[in-house]
């Protein structure tokens, strides 16, 4: 993204002080691309010349989380520490870390603390769990702004995103009023005074991670973004689950939508030659443009990876019981017990209706269109 001229009185607030009740762990400290979600967002923000950056956090922020910033001072109210950074940048960057004065008030608590100490004409306010927000949409938010409105709210597929939005500094008084009334709804401060812009074409920018499932799905998207070709594995713990039939149906669906699909099959057989009605033959007849059959061997996982990444396709589907690559969809037979949590499986594919889990998404084995849509999400298609 190109660098922009500095816009006076446009500040950035990163909300990193929430309870993360659905995630069950601090979202600002989740591992992300060799750092954390907080560090990732802060580093990404350097592309845009904000007047000041404020992090709302109700914990101690370690120096490694804000690389190259030098501590300048602590404001005597005990809620704020200020930093400055100038190494490797065209202009100095001013950073403040503030804690809430009003506890247990959600995002409004962080917004109040930042706006009270650092008045600014406009604020870009972002939740910390937006790993794909790269600040390229900031000009669009600014262009949509109008003086009589208090906020510019992105809308994705009909859903408002008030924690990835532009606000006027004057909403501070509305925040104080809402807090005094114990009304912690963010919508309260922009209701009837906002411009809504359709950002559906840029939906990935606004993808957030509120749950363990959403976090794994975001990691899958990021992993595939950095591969030569995106990969999704379909696995099963036992034979006879129908995963080959499922894969051929998905290949047929995706091929019908115009995607070039590759297929890699992990097998324990040593013979890998072409054979009528073999799994690779069925995949080819379903529409796969490339197939590979990988037998057992000491470096089988590497062989599967090499075969997948050598294919000139839009997506590779891997069928394997144990050697698939992340992300994985696990096919469960109706009689199977509860699936154990693991870091590589993002969804269960089953006919069962009692598989509600905080660790996995659940897809019905007969809903091929939904399966294909979900696979496209993981593959960034």
Walk through the language-model features, giving the residues of each.
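Short, charged/polar "capping" segments at the starts of alpha-helices
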Residues: 60-69, 271-274, 336-340, 353-358
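A charged, well-structured terminal subsegment
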Residues: 177-213, 368-381
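Extreme N-terminal, non-catalytic leader segments
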Residues: 203, 214-233
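Glycine-rich phosphate-binding P-loop
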Residues: 232-255
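N-terminal phosphate/diphosphate-binding loop that engages ATP/GTP or pyrophosphate donors
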Residues: 249-299
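Glycine-rich phosphate-binding loop used to anchor ATP phosphates in small-molecule kinases
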Residues: 296-334
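Phosphate/Mg2+-binding loops and adjacent switch elements
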Residues: 318-381
């Amino acid at each position: 993204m190109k660098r922009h001229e500095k816009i006076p009185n446009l500040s950035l607030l990163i909300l990193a002080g929430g309870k993360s009740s659905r995630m069950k762990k601090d979202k600002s400290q989740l591992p992300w691309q060799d750092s954390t979600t907080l560090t990732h967002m802060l580093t990404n923000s350097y592309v845009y010349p904000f007047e000041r950056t404020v992090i709302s956090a109700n914990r101690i922020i370690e120096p490694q989380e804000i690389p190259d910033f030098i501590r300048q001072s602590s404001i005597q109210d005990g809620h704020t520490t200020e930093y400055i950074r100038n190494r490797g940048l065209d202009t100095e960057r001013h950073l403040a870390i503030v804690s809430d004065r009003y506890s247990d008030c959600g995002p409004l608590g962080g917004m109040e603390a930042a706006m009270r100490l650092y008045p600014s004409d406009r604020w870009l306010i972002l939740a910390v769990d937006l790993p794909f927000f790269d600040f390229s949409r900031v000009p669009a938010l600014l262009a949509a702004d109008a003086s009589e409105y208090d906020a510019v709210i992105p809308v994705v597929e009909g859903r408002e995103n008030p924690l990835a939005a532009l606000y006027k500094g004057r909403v501070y008084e509305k925040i104080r009023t809402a807090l005094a009334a114990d009304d912690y709804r963010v919508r309260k401060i922009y209701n009837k005074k906002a411009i809504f812009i359709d950002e559906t074409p840029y939906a990935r920018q606004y993808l957030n991670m509120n749950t363990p499932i959403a976090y794994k799905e975001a990691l899958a998207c990021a992993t595939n973004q950095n591969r030569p070709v995106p990969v999704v594995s379909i696995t099963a713990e036992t034979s006879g689950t129908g995963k080959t039939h499922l894969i051929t149906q998905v290949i047929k669906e995706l091929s019908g939508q115009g995607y070039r699909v590759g297929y890699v099959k992990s097998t324990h057989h040593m013979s890998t030659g072409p054979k009528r009605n073999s799994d690779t033959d069925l995949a080819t007849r379903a529409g796969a443009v490339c197939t590979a059959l990988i037998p057992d061997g000491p470096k089988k996982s590497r062989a599967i990876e090499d075969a997948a990444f050598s294919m000139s396709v839009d997506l590779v589907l891997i069928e394997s019981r144990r050697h698939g690559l992340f992300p994985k969809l696990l096919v469960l037979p109706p009689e199977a017990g509860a699936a154990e949590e693991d870091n590589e499986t993002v969804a269960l594919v089953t006919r069962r209706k009692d598989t509600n889990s905080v660790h996995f998404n659940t897809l019905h084995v007969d809903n091929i269109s939904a399966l294909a849509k979900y696979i496209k999400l993981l593959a960034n298609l």
